[in-house]
A protein has these predicted regions:
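Single-pass alpha-helical membrane anchors
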Residues: 126-143
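Cell wall/extracellular polymer interaction/catalysis modules
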Residues: 1-117, 123
Length: 143
């Protein structure tokens, strides 16, 4: 199973808003604490019991870090490095709402236990800007 966390924008309150996809299908919105966010890259995932939340969570195997897992929250201050996942997002406020971490764990549970889940974390491509740059380069080099 493949997850992809696409980071869309940084917020005035110190967060990074994004979108989470599971096997190419939109799952929910994400929010990370910009100061403690996971580096971009490809990571394996596993099931981990969280004493803090008294439940199993979908955890991310980040080298040099422990207890990085998807959980609920609304603001960047609700995370010390973990991605928060939710149903809705308020881009102006830099917040999310409607915890989906339990739903995510249940969806991934069997694959997490079998070691068959990976996540790619990256910045989303800004297509309008990218196309403008490519267009300018083509114009410049074909004159």
């Amino acid at each position: 199973m493949n997850l992809e966390l696409l980071r869309d924008s940084e917020t005035a309150n110190g967060g990074i808003l994004g979108r989470l996809y599971v096997d190419g299908q939109f799952f929910g919105y994400t929010l990370e604490n910009a100061a403690a966010a996971i580096p971009a890259g490809l990571f394996s995932m596993f099931a981990r019991f969280s004493p803090k939340f008294n439940s199993f969570k979908a955890a991310i195997d980040v080298p040099g870090r422990e207890y990085i897992m998807f959980h609920g929250g609304n603001t960047p201050g609700d995370s010390a490095g973990c991605p928060l996942v939710a149903k809705s997002m308020d881009a102006d406020a830099g917040t999310i709402a409607g915890d989906l971490s339990g739903v995510l764990y249940e969806r991934l549970k069997n694959d997490l236990e079998a070691g068959n889940v990976v996540i790619t974390i990256r910045r989303a491509t800004n297509w309008p800007v990218l196309l403008a740059i490519v267009g300018a380069a083509v114009y410049f080099f074909t004159r």
